[in-house]
Amino acid sequence: ATFMSGATPAMDGIVGNEWYDRESGKRVTSVSDDKIKLLGGREGATGMSPHRLVGTTVGDEMKLASGGKAKVIGISYKDRSAILPSGKRPNGAYWFNAETGNFVSSTYYFEDLPAWVKAFNHDRHCGAYFGKTWERLLPEGIYQRSEPDDAAYEKSPYDRRFPYTINGGEEKPGRKLYNQFEASPFANEHLVNFAKAAIENEGLGA
């Protein structure tokens, strides 16, 4: 938020990833919004929006300068990283949902997910990575400055040594897979594929 708004946390309203909200008497995240519904996630799940963001971002200023012609879309595996940099009035914001393995959004942006997003979630769901192996890119001896594999502080409930099998420790795709997948390099590939789909379907850069 600070980087894309040019304002300090004291000015842009986003003082952390989460904090205690005195008005509601509970902990909130920077983007949680009880008035908004999640699209593409679990039924009844709380939605996300930039309603706590004060001021404008580069994306908002692009929309203003172009008379609304510019297209701004936020995409990230983290909700806050998709929502806050893209500002108050983007054409959409999408992030990964580890409960369903889908790219999701909220009713702040749409009444329903665009058809191309639904198609991506159906045809190119991260469950397709089930059983893939995450191996080192280079021979083990190359990584002389890296810490030992299976370090004492590692707390993964899955594999702790290369190669890693992306299966969440289960026999079929499910929430544990999605959580493990999110921390693997395959997630970066998946995110890039989604971004390419957004460029093609939203006519970005045209």
Description of each model-found segment:
Residues 1-6:
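N-terminal cofactor/phosphate-binding cores enriched in small/glycine residues
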Residues 7-8, 13-205:
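His/Asp/Glu-rich, glycine-adjacent segments
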